[in-house]
C-alpha cells in the first residue's frame, strides 16, 4: 500500500520538478535583467486563507513598507481573497506567476513549513533531496508548541528564521 501511494505521487513530483527547473532558470534570467524580480517578499499561509500571522505580517509590510516588493499567495476563490486584493499584490496559488515568484523571491514567509510553496508536500520532500527555493525562509509560528519540537530538527527542514510565541521555544 505504501509503495502504491508513492507511485501515485510520481506524476505530481515530475510536474513539480519540471516547473521547478523551468521557473528556476527563467527566474534567474528575470532576476538578472528585470529589476522588478529582485528583492521579492512572498508571504502566505496555506494558500487558501489570510487569517493568521501571515496575513497580519503582509498587511504590515504593505502599509508600513510600500517600497518593498511584496506578494501574498492565495486562491482566487478564498473567502479572504478580497482582503488581499484590497492591499494589492495577490498571487493566484498554483499559477505560473506563483511558481516564478517562488523561485525569484529573496524571502519566503509563512505560517507553515515550506512557506509559500506551490505544493507543500512535494516541496517538503524535494527539500529532503536538497532541491529547494533560493529565498530565505521564515516560519511565523502560530500558537505555542514548546514541547512538540522534534519535527523542527529534521534534516529537510530549511528555515532561516523561526518566529515563536514564547521564550521556552527558543
Where do the protein language model's features map onto the residues?
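Membrane-proximal basic amphipathic "stem/tether" segments
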Residues: 1-40, 47
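Active-site and donor-binding regions of nucleotide-sugar-utilizing enzymes
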Residues: 39-170
Amino acid at each position: 500500500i505504501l509503495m502504491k501511494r508513492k507511485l501515485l505521487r510520481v506524476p505530481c513530483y515530475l510536474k513539480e520538478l519540471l516547473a521547478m527547473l523551468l521557473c528556476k532558470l527563467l527566474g534567474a534570467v528575470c532576476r538578472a535583467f528585470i529589476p522588478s524580480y529582485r528583492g521579492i517578499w512572498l508571504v502566505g499561509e496555506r494558500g487558501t486563507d489570510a487569517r493568521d500571522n501571515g496575513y497580519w505580517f503582509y498587511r504590515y509590510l504593505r502599509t508600513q513598507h510600500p517600497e518593498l516588493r511584496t506578494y501574498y499567495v492565495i486562491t482566487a476563490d478564498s473567502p479572504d481573497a478580497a482582503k488581499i486584493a484590497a492591499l494589492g499584490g495577490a498571487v493566484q496559488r498554483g499559477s505560473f506567476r506563483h511558481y516564478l515568484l517562488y523561485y525569484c523571491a529573496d524571502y519566503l514567509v509563512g505560517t507553515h513549513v515550506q512557506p509559500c510553496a506551490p505544493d507543500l508536500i512535494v516541496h517538503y520532500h524535494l527539500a529532503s533531496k536538497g532541491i529547494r527555493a533560493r529565498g530565505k525562509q521564515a516560519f511565523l509560528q502560530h500558537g505555542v508548541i514548546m514541547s512538540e519540537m522534534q519535527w523542527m530538527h529534521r534534516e529537510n527542514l530549511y528555515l532561516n528564521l523561526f518566529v515563536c510565541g514564547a521564550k521556552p521555544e527558543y
